[in-house]
Amino acid sequence: ESIVRPPPVEAKVEETPE
């Protein structure tokens, strides 16, 4: 199984903290 899926949105929270 070589299915590449995008990272979870929660991971982007670290880059863009509110």
UniProtKB/Swiss-Prot annotation:
Any one of the GO BP annotations: positive regulation of leukocyte migration
Disulfides per UniProt: none
Source organism: Potamotrygon orbignyi
Tissue-by-tissue expression: Expressed by the venom gland.
Membrane-traversing stretches: none
Protein name, UniProt field: Porflan
Compartments where found: Secreted
Keywords attached to this entry: Secreted, Toxin
Described function: Inflammatory peptide. Induces leukocyte recruitment and adherence to the vascular endothelium when applied to mouse cremaster muscle.
Gene Ontology CC terms: extracellular region
